[in-house]
From Swiss-Prot:
Site (Stabilizes the basic form of H active site to accept a proton): D93
Top-level EC class: hydrolase
Site label Discriminates between blocked and unblocked aminoacyl-tRNA, positions: N10
Pfam families to which the protein is assigned, alphabetical: Pept_tRNA_hydro
Keyword Transferase among record annotations: no
Protein name from the UniProt record: Peptidyl-tRNA hydrolase
Catalytic activity of the protein: an N-acyl-L-alpha-aminoacyl-tRNA + H2O = an N-acyl-L-amino acid + a tRNA + H(+)
Binding-site residues, tRNA: Y15, F66, N68, N114
Length: 199
């Protein structure tokens, strides 16, 4: 069962269209589907709303704390509503997957993602679900061999190219039904459905 879906990103118009905000894009789509408007919730350090999705009430959250402090928002809402770590899905950009790929997994390391790292620290566990939305890696760009840390930061804080954006949008669309299966407690089918079409 899933009770909270968190999208990771950075607040502010200047970050809205950047690769790092792929998690926000997914949550925005779910809010539209659930006919809800996310509102500023100071006690939860973000934009939050309850949506009716897959015949269940599910909280949606977009932290407004900037990426590396996302855990504060997640733990605040989860504690208030007594939501357990394994009832949480965190949607985030994933550089180890190409644009158009999406994968679900529970637990595991942060893979260098500061948002995931902070959430694990605040929840004191890594046993929450992650929806990894592929955005690609700068080393795969022309002349991108041996991309350093600065290249990575610049890459995630820039908008994807048009064809990449289209692929990411398609991956988000394709993630909706598997998320519904996961929300209803069928994790195996959720992963099988999403991963059989993952590129």
């Amino acid at each position: 069962m899933i009770k909270l879906i968190v999208g990771l990103g950075n607040p502010g118009a200047e970050y809205e269209a950047t690769r790092h905000n792929a998690g926000f894009w997914l949550v925005d789509q779910l809010a539209r589907m659930g006919g809800t408007t996310l509102r500023v919730e100071g006690r939860f350090h973000g934009l939050a709303g309850r949506a009716r999705l897959w015949d269940q009430d599910i909280w949606l959250l977009k932290p407004s704390t900037f990426m590396n402090r996302s855990g504060l928002a997640v733990v605040s809402l989860a504690r208030f509503y007594k939501i357990l770590p394994d009832e949480i899905v965190v949607a985030h950009d994933e550089m180890d997957l190409p644009p158009g790929a999406a994968k679900l997994k529970r637990g595991g390391g942060a893979g260098g993602h500061n948002g995931l790292k902070d959430i694990a620290a605040h929840l004191t566990t890594q046993e929450f679900w992650r929806l990894r939305l592929g955005v690609g890696h700068p080393r795969n760009l022309p002349g991108g061999a041996g991309a350093g840390r600065e290249d990575v930061v610049n890459f995630v804080l820039k908008p994807p190219r048009k064809e990449e954006q289209q692929a990411i949008d398609e991956a988000i669309d394709r993630s909706i039904d598997p998320l519904g299966l996961l929300a209803r407690g069928d994790a195996e089918r959720a992963m099988a459905q999403l991963h059989t079409v993952a590129r």
